[in-house]
Curated annotation (Swiss-Prot):
Record function comment: Catalyzes the reduction of the glycolytic intermediate dihydroxyacetone phosphate (DHAP) to sn-glycerol 3-phosphate (G3P), the key precursor for phospholipid synthesis.
EC number(s) from the headed UniProt entry: 1.1.1.94
Record-given protein name: Glycerol-3-phosphate dehydrogenase [NAD(P)+]
Provenance organism: Synechococcus sp. (strain RCC307)
Active site: 161
Pfam families the record matches: NAD_Gly3P_dh_C (PF07479), NAD_Gly3P_dh_N (PF01210)
Amino acid sequence: MALTIGVLGGGAWGSTLAGLLSQGGHRVQIWRREHGPQALQALAASEVLVGATALVGVSGMAQQIKGWSARPIVSCSKGLDPSSGQTASALWKAACPLWPVVVLSGPNLASELQQGLPAASVLAGHDEGLLSTLQQQLSTEQFRLYRNNDPLGTELAGALKNVMAVAAGICDGLQLGANARASLLTRALAEMATVLHGLGGRQDTLYGLAGIGDLLATATSPLSRNYRFGLCMADGLDRQQALEKVGATVEGVPTCEAIASLGRQKQWSLPITESVALLLQGALSPAQALQQLMQRELRCE
């Protein structure tokens, strides 16, 4: 059944999703920031909204539409709000408590999807009926959707892998080799599990598309902004220079700071996140960060 869908956010991911949904036969309208708040009203009649703004814009966007009638919103923003540590779906729910919110996350590099290459992703939420309906309505031959009932774990995995992709970019930029990259990503998965467990997500979510799937895509491909940012840091650029060279939102940066701060409060062992945070602050060089990781106390895996 064709739906009227409003896509909030016209960046790479929002534009890609709008294209996929249009190809699936839906009537799609997209709102970009440059359109201004008045143009947003054109999406008020949408049956489903897709939230694809950068995470920093979610709270403001939610405030603008909270007076609309309730309808499903598919939250696609990956990261944690640096001021509150909340996920995108939590920000949507805070402003629009009566709206059903589901999470879309997975190994979805926008440029590959724009080329017509296949991909899969996860729809996560607690309303099985809604999930099943949206799964059937939004899946296409190119873009296959699975579903799970762990939206928090799905969302956290999508946020955390951005931090690990920065670390992987640094590792590859230093030309440390395949062994080092494999070791880093394996320990990254364990670190992500620590955070998921501590915040109430399910650790088994990490072994699906939203976890290891997204991690492998984002932490190994130069198409990933977070990975490219890490490469730039390894080349000796500072934080601002690296951001300017990437030229697009790098969600791993504010997410790293939020997770590192939370980890210190909770006394979690998050050595990769902590090392990346110190790099971002300019307190460590890439080589010093590597040395710090390699000199940690020996223990059981």
